[in-house]
């Protein structure tokens, strides 16, 4: 089980990424625009650097919804491999069954 502070930190990162998404996209568009002047591009880089570090989506980590475990995350279900197996064995995941051949 992950610490509550780690789970809260991830929630904070998601909220910050949502809040600054439009501004970050606008600045990145200016930076990647080849027709923009060098000065405009440089100013956009400086403004992008002033945004909060946690507002970047690449800072987010996928975590299990039940335990907060960061490793062994199965994105389709939002659970770690351990909790997914437990749920599947109890028959709580529709259409998922143990392989047998």
Swiss-Prot record:
PROSITE patterns: RIBOSOMAL_S14. The keyword Translocase does not apply. It comes from the Bacteria. GO terms for biological process: translation. Disulfide bonds: none annotated. One of its GO terms (cellular component) is small ribosomal subunit. Part of the 30S ribosomal subunit. Contacts proteins S3 and S10. Binds 16S rRNA, required for the assembly of 30S particles and may also be responsible for determining the conformation of the 16S rRNA at the A site. Belongs to the universal ribosomal protein uS14 family. This is Small ribosomal subunit protein uS14. It comes from Citrobacter koseri (strain ATCC BAA-895 / CDC 4225-83 / SGSC4696). The lineage of its organism: Bacteria, Pseudomonadati, Pseudomonadota, Gammaproteobacteria, Enterobacterales.
